[in-house]
Amino acid sequence: MFLDSFLHKKFFSTIEKKSLLPSKSSLLVAFSGGQDSLTLVKLLYDLNPFYRWRITLIHFDHRWRWDSMLASKQVFSFARYYNFPLYYFECPDYLNTEEASRKWRYTTLIDLAVKNNFTKILLAHTATDSSETLLSNLFRGTSLDGLASIGWSCQLAQSVYIVRPLLNFYRFETSWFCRKYYLPIWVDRSNYDYIMFRNRLRQELVPYIKSYFQPNLEERCYSLSSLVKYDTDFLEQEALRIYFILIHQDLIAINHTALRLLHLSVQSRIFKIFFIANLNFNPNSRQIEDVIIFIKQNILSQINMNNYILVMDDIWFYVGVKIIKFS
């Protein structure tokens, strides 16, 4: 029987209630060999006789550690044992930062999914990951969006969705699951490098808070981020609805006289949508604040934003020309 543990039941209940993984879906599963991804793949394998998914694994080797090839060999052995097809990608040498590597991983996932007709890209993010992200963003300084939980599912491209079916799982649960089923966890030594902010948070700060302040810290953080997500989703939808009412029909412009009447929270979100949609530019909070102050002063003038001239007349705030710099 495929529901032979409480985590099997939890996983089955989650994907059914949220309709995350319909029967016969084509799944591309990011597989690192760590305990979270091992748990996800094992659960998919056990439930597959019921759902009949087409499951394929993908592994990214960043070659940042001397033992990364050994980790990859273990991933290959696991995939072979469970008879899963596996894609293997080595990170290019020039991608030497976490952010650049992250963009490369997501680009590769999307391209591969589109070319091979995968409808779901699965990531083994857990509630523990979500709580660590919340704390990390809080310490670094963030907006309300930075406190919101990552979504269960979101659309990346036409007919391709990214799905995180373990978002209500905790790391102690995936650790127990791997021990129960003798799954070969590959221990990433870099997770214990305290030079990295997130590792110190995970290994030192979180255990300290759980010991002396809040033993259910991860659950509390997950609950908070989930509640914040409801509010931010509503604000985003409301901002998008108003954005389409206020934009010019022909020009890259927005009605600033009507915009000024809105709450500052909605104004900032509308401007963010405006810049991303028209200029492919994601402004930071300081830049958005500068624009809001500019239109509030109601001076018929212009400002420079990311090498674009932004102009304001009696009614419209619009994009003028792009500044081209010659070296």
UniProtKB/Swiss-Prot annotation:
EC number(s) stated in the UniProt entry for this protein: 6.3.4.19
Domain of life: Eukaryota
Cystine bridges: none
Broad class of where this protein is predominantly found: plastid
Entry-linked InterPro entries: Rossmann-like_a/b/a_fold, TilS/TtcA_N, tRNA_Ile_lys_synt, tRNA_Ile_lys_synt_N
Catalysed reactions, as listed in the record: cytidine(34) in tRNA(Ile2) + L-lysine + ATP = lysidine(34) in tRNA(Ile2) + AMP + diphosphate + H(+)
Broad enzyme group: ligase
Single GO BP term: tRNA modification
GO-annotated cellular components: chloroplast
This protein's record includes keyword Acetylation: no
Compartmental location: Plastid, Chloroplast
Chain residues that bind ATP: 32-37
Keywords (A to Z) from UniProt: ATP-binding, Chloroplast, Ligase, Nucleotide-binding, Plastid, tRNA processing
One MF annotation (Gene Ontology) recorded for this entry: ATP binding
Family to which this protein belongs: Belongs to the tRNA(Ile)-lysidine synthase family.
HAMAP family: tRNA_Ile_lys_synt
Function (record text): Ligates lysine onto the cytidine present at position 34 of the AUA codon-specific tRNA(Ile) that contains the anticodon CAU, in an ATP-dependent manner. Cytidine is converted to lysidine, thus changing the amino acid specificity of the tRNA from methionine to isoleucine.
Domain remark in the UniProt entry: The N-terminal region contains the highly conserved SGGXDS motif, predicted to be a P-loop motif involved in ATP binding.
UniProt name for this protein: tRNA(Ile)-lysidine synthase, chloroplastic
Source organism of the structure: Porphyra purpurea (Red seaweed)
